[in-house]
From Swiss-Prot:
<dbReference type="GO" id="GO:0009898">
    <property type="term" value="C:cytoplasmic side of plasma membrane"/>
</dbReference>
<dbReference type="Pfam" id="PF07647">
    <property type="entry name" value="SAM_2"/>
</dbReference>
<dbReference type="GO" id="GO:0007169">
    <property type="term" value="P:cell surface receptor protein tyrosine kinase signaling pathway"/>
</dbReference>
<dbReference type="InterPro" id="IPR052268">
    <property type="entry name" value="SAM_domain-containing_protein"/>
</dbReference>
<feature type="domain" description="SAM">
    <location>
        <begin position="118"/>
        <end position="184"/>
    </location>
</feature>
<dbReference type="InterPro" id="IPR013761">
    <property type="entry name" value="SAM/pointed_sf"/>
</dbReference>
<dbReference type="InterPro" id="IPR001660">
    <property type="entry name" value="SAM"/>
</dbReference>
<dbReference type="InterPro" id="IPR039144">
    <property type="entry name" value="Aveugle-like_SAM_dom"/>
</dbReference>
<protein>
    <recommendedName>
        <fullName>Sterile alpha motif domain-containing protein 10</fullName>
    </recommendedName>
</protein>
Length: 202
């Protein structure tokens, strides 16, 4: 009796083996499909990472940190100006102001340099412009004594007579033009001093 009941309740061995075999085959199919999916995903990731990516930088775009740092270092070099001890105005600024005054001031005439820096040729040009009547006489005397701009400002009647200008009219003509030149140079010096003092105050 018990043997018949057990045989009825328990499934046949052939059917159970078939069910177990079918379940095992389904697990194998799922594992194979999962492996193929992972492999495809891995190959896609590797192929995407192996593609070289070079973005061209178009003109006008923002620079990178390294580019901006190198340009900032190149453009931020300090420029030092010479400065005399005890003064607040750098020499570079003072000289540039004086240079601009000599060349751009409308009240100083056509001179581009101070008279003390004139050469013998500059003095001869000045004589030709301001003393045209006896120009050849003056040029010969001035050339023999190598009169420069500094010596021109120091001329007087006695020196002109020793230079060979025996006529009083000639000496007076030269001295009159020298006096005008001295007045103009003194005005220029005062203007330079006032400009320098104004620069220190500002």
């Amino acid at each position: 009796m018990f043997t018949e009941l057990r045989s009825k309740l328990s499934p046949p061995r052939g059917r159970a083996g078939a069910v177990r075999a079918g379940f095992g085959e389904r697990r194998d199919v799922d594992a194979t499909a999962h492996f193929s999916f992972c492999r495809t995903l891995l190959e896609h990731t590797v192929s995407a990472e192996s593609i070289p990516c070079h973005l061209p930088r178009t003109p006008g775009t923002s620079l990178t940190w390294h580019d901006s740092r190198s340009q900032r270092a190149a453009s931020s070099r300090p420029i030092k100006l010479l400065q005399q001890p005890g003064t607040d105005t750098p020499q570079g600024r003072l000289y540039s102001d004086h240079y601009g005054l000599y060349h751009t001031s409308p009240s100083l005439g056509g001179l581009t340099r101070p008279v003390v820096l004139w050469s013998q040729q500059d003095v001869c040009k000045w004589l030709k412009k301001h003393c045209p009547h006896n120009y050849l006489v003056y040029v010969e005397a001035f050339s023999q004594h190598a009169i420069t701009g500094r010596a021109l400002l120091r001329l007087n009647a006695e020196k002109l007579q020793r230079m060979g200008l025996a006529q009083e009219a000639q000496r007076q003509e030269v001295l009159q033009q020298v006096l005008r030149l001295q007045v103009r140079e003194e005005g220029r010096s005062l203007q330079l001093l006032s400009q320098a003092s104004f620069g220190k105050m500002s």
